[in-house]
């Protein structure tokens, strides 16, 4: 016999003006004494692909030993607390990305192979690749999340036409995610816009902008909802929610600071809203990615 209690739907949002704030997984979302694997709160299948255009040093990633007792390298050391849930695979080759004697160049177009496994067509006018694995996964699991997929980047990749390298279309250089063989998906490089895509509730850009002018923080828009929601939570869930909301506010603060700094330090290369510092830009985008997973966006 199962003892059940009224539980919180997994897709619960805190709502305010122009804001729909997703919540992290809480114990209150799991029916009492119900096997977690049988509930909507069961561990979900999610995917992230991270492309390093200039590659990495394999020796710093691949462990020396095989089997469950391998030793983490210094660069993978942060994963050690999750050893029982981590699999490191090495020794793989993507032959479609190899250069040939007939075509020694075009290395910048090789990023298109990363998630597709397909050698890009050497055509600057009509690029053709294939559906990438992230989009195949999005087709199967994307209906369970607020966004089926989101593409984040660091450098402006809005130009997907023309010849970028050895006769290859710029689309191969600028997009690693393809919806279909002829549609590369653009990356979002502005952390503020990425943040608003995650937490806006579908209103127009103008309405979201007006909401920002009325409220200093996205969280300010849902402040009145938080106490009402928390009173039905246990102490563990209250602490978990507080930690999550703190992370949201901190990332928002850093985005605002970086935006203000970028506006103050006028640059011909960096558009408004994008941090001047590459290090800060990288860190914010990675933290946005973590937040998206935490809230299952």
Tell where the protein language model's regions lie, with residue ranges.
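Ligand-binding pockets and gating/stacking loops
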Residues: 1-297
């Amino acid at each position: 016999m199962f003892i059940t209690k009224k539980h919180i739907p997994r897709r619960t949002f805190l709502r305010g003006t122009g804001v729909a704030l997703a919540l992290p997984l809480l114990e209150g979302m799991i029916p009492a004494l119900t096997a977690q694997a049988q509930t909507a709160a069961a561990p979900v299948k999610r995917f992230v692909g991270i492309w390093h255009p200039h590659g990495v040093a394999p020796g710093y990633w691949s462990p020396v030993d095989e089997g469950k007792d391998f030793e983490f390298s210094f660069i993978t050391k942060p994963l050690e607390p999750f050893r029982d849930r981590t699999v490191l695979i090495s020794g793989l080759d993507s032959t479609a990305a190899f250069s040939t004697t007939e075509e020694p160049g075009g290395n910048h177009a090789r990023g298109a192979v990363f998630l597709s496994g397909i050698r890009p067509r050497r055509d600057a006018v009509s690029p053709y690749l294939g559906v990438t694995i992230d989009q195949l996964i999005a087709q199967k699991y994307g209906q369970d999340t607020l966004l089926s997929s989101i593409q984040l980047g660091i450098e402006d990749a809005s130009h997907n036409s023309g010849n970028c390298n050895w006769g290859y279309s710029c689309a191969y250089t600028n997009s690693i995610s393809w919806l279909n063989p002829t549609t590369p998906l653009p990356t979002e490089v502005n952390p503020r816009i990425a943040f608003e895509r995650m937490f806006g509730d579908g209103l127009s850009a103008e309405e979201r902008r007006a909401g920002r002018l009325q409220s200093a923080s996205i969280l300010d828009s849902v402040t009145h909802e938080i106490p009402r929601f928390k009173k039905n939570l246990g102490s563990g869930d209250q602490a978990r929610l507080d930690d999550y909301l703190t992370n949201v506010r901190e990332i928002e603060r850093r985005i605002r600071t970086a935006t203000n700094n970028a506006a103050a330090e006028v640059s011909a290369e960096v558009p408004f809203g994008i941090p001047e510092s590459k290090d800060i830009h990288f860190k914010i985008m990675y933290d946005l990615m973590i937040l998206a997973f935490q809230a299952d966006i």
